[in-house]
Amino acid sequence: MSLDDRLAAPRAMAPEMCSLNMGTMNFALYPAAARITEWRHDWEKPFLEGSDDLVFKNTPRDIARILQDLGAERSARFEFECYDIGHLEMLRHFADRGLVAPPFFIQFVFGVLG
């Protein structure tokens, strides 16, 4: 999915607040496939099993564009999702550049392979 595709809904809906992952990462959910015995939908198992090759792209350029497009231009506030220490450093980087200012709403997400 392109960045424009990802931005289409928040551009149309103009939320007051939205989530922003602070970096590119793997969402390696495949270990769950071995633990689940009943599936509700036929896409669930292949999706989980295939997550060992899934990358969620959110580069510094992507993040800067999101901050500009939704934040500066549409006044959205962000809930910054940080999955590791590097994501906190990325947030500091954008604060140092003046693209985002405190107070920060930070969601620490731990326990995801990635």
Residue ranges and their predicted role:
Residues 2-13, 86-93:
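Catalytic cores of alpha/beta
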Residues 17-114:
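Catalytic alpha/beta core domains of metabolic enzymes, predominantly
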